[in-house]
UniProtKB/Swiss-Prot annotation:
Name of the protein in its database record: Glycosylphosphatidylinositol anchor biosynthesis protein 11
Molecular function as annotated in GO: mannose-ethanolamine phosphotransferase activity
Main subcellular location: endoplasmic reticulum
GO (cellular component) term, any one: endoplasmic reticulum membrane
Similarity comment: family membership: Belongs to the PIGF family.
Species whose genome carries this gene: Yarrowia lipolytica (strain CLIB 122 / E 150)
Membrane-crossing segments per the record: 25-45, 52-72, 88-108, 120-140, 158-178, 189-209
Gene designation: GPI11
Length: 223
């Protein structure tokens, strides 16, 4: 009975429980993404959102793949070539998944005709941020993905960052309808910013939750 319970707990837990150094690197990387977002704004996103977001895609993709290989794939005895291959597959799947996110954006009110390029490129940014690390960490395990979609998966910082990326993008849409006549209110600049900020907040929140669980577990063992 105890063996079955332990096996069930392991199956429902995160695929990769990060060590202290990995958690620190995850926070550093989240901060780096905020710097990258600042770079996107300084590149003139308010003048030509579609062009600047498109030009920023390769950099984001390389950054996220590197993060997956160096931080999320940092496991003893695992070859880096395996992690690189997994990251490439995850990247391809995230690009494909951007079509679904594009559909969701349109469903929630995104311009379906006039600003298709803007919407689709924004969907690609969101998919790379939210989906690529999930595919890298959890692969194509149907049971795990059923738990992720149903929000039954225990939160680690990878899952939390993905969820908060989508929440941040949703919250980012709030300023757009207001009649403030600000350049940054163009579609979908605030949604893009919300996604990046959400990723950072989710990473911090997920790590805080991991540390809390670890501390509680150690406390119970000492009692």
């Amino acid at each position: 009975m105890a063996t079955r319970k332990a096996a069930k707990t392991k199956a429902n837990g995160p695929a990769h429980v990060p060590s202290g150094p990995s958690q620190v690197l995850a926070v550093v990387y989240g901060t780096l993404l905020l710097v990258y977002l600042r770079f996107i704004f300084s590149a003139g996103i308010t003048h030509d959102p579609a062009k600047v977001m498109t030009q920023a895609l390769p950099g984001l993709l390389l950054l996220h793949m590197g993060y997956c290989v160096v931080v999320l794939g940092n496991k003893p005895g695992r070859k880096i070539g395996t992690d690189v291959s997994t990251a490439m597959i995850a990247a391809a799947l995230s690009v494909f998944f951007s079509v679904i996110i594009f559909g969701l954006l349109v469903l929630f009110g995104a311009p379906a005709i006039s600003l298709v390029h803007n919407t689709f490129v924004c969907a690609m940014h969101m998919s790379i941020l939210a989906v690529l690390p999930l595919f890298f960490t959890y692969h194509l395990d149907s049971k795990v993905w059923a738990d992720i979609i149903a929000m039954r998966r225990p939160l680690d910082h990878v899952y939390a960052a993905s969820v908060c990326t989508l929440i941040g993008a949703w919250l980012g849409a709030i300023p757009i309808p207001y009649d403030w006549d600000r350049p940054w209110q163009q579609w979908p600049i605030t949604i893009l910013a919300g996604a990046y900020l959400g990723y950072f907040v989710g990473t911090l929140g997920g790590i805080a939750l991991e540390l809390t669980k670890s501390l509680c577990s150690k406390t119970k063992k000492t009692e």
